[in-house]
């Protein structure tokens, strides 16, 4: 079944190529080139826009990003350690001191 689909798709591609649908040369002139305008950094006239003002959030950024994700990471690791201990995969022992 898969081989038949491959044969049919190749035959369809060849028929479209013969009809000029896929391999036809472009009718656009290569002498006219379109220059893209990057509106984020330049105006339509080509001048560079001034650098935008940077707004610093400082401690607000620390409190809203770092601290909640540290707390979530702590909860995940605590729950995973409890799961390992519950299934006797890793049980910490105090008898490891062989000094």
From Swiss-Prot:
Cell location: Mitochondrion inner membrane
ATP-binding is among the record's keywords: no
One of the protein's GO biological processes: mitochondrial calcium ion homeostasis
Coiled-coil segments: none
Parts of the chain that traverse the membrane: 58-77
Mitochondrion keyword on record: yes
UniProt keyword list: Calcium, Calcium transport, Ion transport, Membrane, Mitochondrion, Mitochondrion inner membrane, Transit peptide, Transmembrane, Transmembrane helix, Transport
Similarity comment: family membership: Belongs to the SMDT1/EMRE family.
Protein name per its UniProtKB record: Essential MCU regulator, mitochondrial
Organism in which the protein naturally occurs: Xenopus tropicalis
Organism placement in taxonomy: Eukaryota, Metazoa, Chordata, Craniata, Vertebrata
């Amino acid at each position: 079944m898969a081989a038949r689909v491959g044969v049919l798709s190749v035959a369809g591609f060849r028929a479209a190529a013969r009809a000029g649908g896929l391999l036809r040369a472009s009718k656009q002139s290569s002498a006219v080139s379109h220059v893209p305008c990057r509106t984020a950094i330049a105006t339509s006239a080509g001048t560079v826009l001034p650098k935008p003002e940077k707004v610093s959030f400082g401690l607000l950024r620390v409190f809203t990003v770092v601290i909640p994700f540290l707390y979530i990471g702590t909860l995940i690791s605590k729950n995973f350690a409890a799961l390992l201990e519950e299934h006797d995969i890793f049980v910490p022992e105090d008898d490891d001191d062989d000094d």
